[in-house]
Amino acid sequence: MVTHALRVGNTFGLAVFRAGAGYALRMAPRRIVSLVPSLTEALFAFGVGERVVGRTRYCTQPPRCVGGVEKVGGTKKVDVGRVLDLEPDLVVAVREENARESVEALRAAGVPIFLGAPETVADALEMLEKLAGIVEAPRAEAVIGPIERVYEGLRRARPVRRPRTFVPIWKGPYMGVGSDTYVHDVIEVSGGENVCGAHTRYPIVSPEEIEAFQPEVVLLPDEPYPFSAEDLAEFYALDIPAAHGDRIHLVDGKLLTWYGPRMAGSLRQLSALLRLP
């Protein structure tokens, strides 16, 4: 019997890792549908990829492994009927990425749901540990151990000064990341000071407000909004230290938003970008 409980909290009324009573699966799941791209990658890294029978069209990693896995729609628009046809004994979802309606429909159909709600790097680590336990992952330590070591190293490092950092996740209008988001904690753990940290969720900010923030580093991710080289000129035109010091960087959005095996490398890369000369 799998003894790792899925704790039922008040988010969606489903399984989240926060508070409340729990229930346990009777055995390790054999037919898993993942609705979260980064956790699909994690399941393969854990050594249980052969049990993944369904994925979203955005679950593209690892590319050599997911090609033969059935697609069940997108992260927000899941084909619930297709998921049920696959007869899963576990569906993996995350509050921030998946639509409440889809997850509730699957739960109502009696499908066990693993629903994570990570708002910090520590939350993400706990989520990975719980998922690894539930699926009885043979390679859990190989995946999670390096992340824990990098995370603890960065926590101990405590930079003398944290550069003011702006990370937009959208354009038209620009949207930053507030203090209750996973990206905020990634910035802070990596050594930066999120200039939108006084806000919650995803605040809309104008170019004038960005100038008022006076960010020393700007990171432009390629997801969810696909910032590209064409957007650099708009930020270099602003009167901000990041422009004067040539510290406006295009980055892979997965560095900021993906949980799983790439977290250790992501934190290392971000800490290097946020280290002032």
PLM segments and residue spans:
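Short terminal hydrophobic/aromatic SLiMs and anchors at protein ends
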Residues: 2-3, 10
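Compositionally biased, low-complexity segments enriched in small residues
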Residues: 6-7, 23
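N-terminal ligand-binding lobe of clamshell/alpha-beta domains
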Residues: 12-277
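Short linear motifs in low-complexity or flexible loops
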Residues: 3-5, 15
